[in-house]
UniProtKB/Swiss-Prot annotation:
Transmembrane domains' residue ranges: 10-30, 43-63
GO cellular component, as recorded: plasma membrane
Any one Gene Ontology BP term: DNA damage response
Classification via InterPro entries: YiaA-like, YiaAB
Domain of life of the native organism: Bacteria
Name this protein carries in UniProt: Uncharacterized membrane protein YubF
Location(s), subcellular: Cell membrane
Membrane topology classification: Multi-pass membrane protein
Keywords linked to the UniProt accession: Cell membrane, Membrane, Transmembrane, Transmembrane helix
Length: 87
């Protein structure tokens, strides 16, 4: 029986969480320092909002994939343990 391999590496999982939190942090700094919004600041906010959106999507995907992988691995280990007991 082939062992199931996780879809996401630890590095990718950390990067997904980092991207989300970095976007939220940078957006918060920008809001704190915003007095009047000039054109370059509007571009900054658009870029950071895109970063937050991508980070949120990646974080959701990684969390869901990791949860599904844990279920699959647990089921596979259960089957493997049952086959060892039967033989």
């Amino acid at each position: 029986m082939q062992k199931y391999r996780r879809r996401n590496t630890v590095a990718f999982t950390v990067l997904a969480y980092f991207t989300f939190f970095a976007g939220v942090f940078l957006f918060s700094i920008g809001l704190y320092n915003a007095d009047n919004l000039e054109l370059n600041e509007k571009g900054y906010y658009i870029a950071v909002m895109i970063l937050v959106a991508v980070g949120a999507i990646l974080t959701q995907k990684v969390t869901r994939d990791n949860a599904e992988d844990n279920e699959i691995i647990a089921e596979q280990e259960k089957r493997q343990n049952q086959s060892h007991i039967e033989s």
